[in-house]
From Swiss-Prot:
It comes from Chlorobaculum tepidum (strain ATCC 49652 / DSM 12025 / NBRC 103806 / TLS). Monomer. This is Phosphoglycerate kinase. PANTHER family: PHOSPHOGLYCERATE KINASE, PHOSPHOGLYCERATE KINASE 1, CHLOROPLASTIC-RELATED. ATP binds at K203, G294, E325, G354, G355, D356, S357.
């Protein structure tokens, strides 16, 4: 997907309307608890400022449900951004309207204006054309750098492009497309995908898409128990999607037909309940005790998976191996994170596909030891499923 980017256009003196993803977590006192998304937008923001553009930033934050709610104001973000850039960031009182337009027209080259939360207006998520047109009237150039919302056709990501001639990708989207696109279309082999998470149902399309591309799939997380039950094994009280047993069998057959090795755990960590102080033990998957719940991959599986990861040239990881929020069930997930870091050090391309895996690799302190951590959970999954992302399709080729 070759899209025009920030590097392809002249910015001097132009009003640049940039959609960023500043949907950051805030604590009770409205302090930002994780500023990763703000930091990741800085290269695109600095490019506009340094090239004398007049920057207007827009984002959503949380789910205010189409009503003005001060708890979801972007003002803490504007304040933090101003500190990171070491220059003033003016906070607008809304994202459309006469006052906002006056603030926009008063901007000088290199100035930054932050619009208020787009989702204070129900028209944003409804992709309302009048709202999109009003947003578009604020800028002369549109830049989308919000990969995390690229799979949604909203007014600020898709609708707006119908009213602006110049619509380009920011550096963050460019980087996402480069890494995820390379993984899917031009991967160095062996190509290993690691899929975790609780349910097969959320990963069917990804699995089927990956069967066309990868050499090996390593499966972890609670979804393994649906596969095990489908194979006739006892899984104790582990999570099983009873209505997906036939699907699990067909996925195993599909992998075989495509010559893809699909590896399931050989041992698991089990406990009687999901809690930090529940006594746990390792059991082979062929002998899971009645009443026990599988909550992580076991040491033998960790060893096997580690070896597969270290033999790979391209690795894609989406979804944890167990309940990593609880330390005693986090070993598998952190071992995978470490194996990815080690593979990267040996020259492999390693890509973390957003969501829980991104949180896990951050918790392991290894985010900067892999090639690429995707910023979009749902967006990276849909991209890996081979779906077209509306927010990206809408940009200039």
């Amino acid at each position: 997907m070759q899209k025009k980017t920030l590097s392809d256009i002249s910015l001097q003196g132009k009003r640049v309307l940039m959609r960023v993803d500043f949907n950051v977590p805030l604590d009770q006192d409205r302090n930002i608890t994780d500023e990763k998304r703000i930091v990741e937008a800085l290269p695109s923001i600095r490019k506009v400022i340094d090239n004398g553009g007049r920057l207007i930033l827009m984002s959503h934050l949380g789910r205010p449900k189409g009503k003005v709610n001060p708890a979801f104001s972007l003002s803490p973000v504007a304040k933090r951004l101003s500190e990171l850039l070491d220059c003033p960031v003016t906070m607008a009182g809304d994202c459309i309207g006469t006052e906002v337009m006056q603030q926009v027209l008063a901007l000088q080259d290199g100035d930054v204006l932050m619009l208020e939360n787009l989702r204070f207006h129900p028209e944003e998520e409804a992709n309302d054309p009048d709202f999109a047109r009003e947003l578009a009237s604020l800028g002369e150039i549109y830049v989308n750098d919000a990969f995390g919302t690229a799979h949604r056709a909203h007014a600020s990501t898709e609708g707006i492009t119908h009213f602006m001639q110049t619509a380009v990708a920011g550096y963050l989207i460019e980087k996402e497309l480069r890494y995820l696109g390379t993984a899917l279309n031009d991967a160095q082999r062996p190509f290993v995908a690691i899929l975790g998470g609780a349910k097969i149902s959320g990963k069917i399309d990804v699995l089927e898409s990956l069967f066309e591309k990868v050499d090996t799939v390593l499966v972890g997380g609670a979804m393994v128990f649906t596969f095990f039950k489908a194979q006739g094994l006892d899984v104790g009280n582990s999570l099983v999607e009873e209505n997906k047993l036939e699907l699990a069998v067909s996925l195993l057959e599909k992998a075989k037909a495509k010559n893809v090795r699909l590896l399931l755990p050989e041992d698991v960590v089990v406990a009687g309940e999901i809690s930090a102080d529940a006594p746990s033990r390792v059991e082979p998957v062929s002998a899971i005790s009645a009443g026990m719940i599988g909550l992580d991959i076991g040491p033998a599986t960790i060893e096997t998976y580690r070896k597969e990861i270290l033999d790979a040239k391209t690795v894609l990881w989406n979804g944890p191996m167990g309940v990593f929020e609880i330390d005693q069930f986090a070993r598998g997930t952190f071992a995978v994170a470490q194996a990815l870091a080690d593979a990267t050090a040996e020259g492999a391309i390693t890509i973390i596909g957003g969501g829980d895996s991104a949180a896990a690799i951050a918790k392991a302190g290894l985010s900067d030891k892999v090639t690429h951590v995707s910023t979009g959970g749902g967006a990276s999954l849909e991209f890996l499923e081979g779906k077209e992302l509306p927010g990206i399709a809408a940009l200039n080729d």
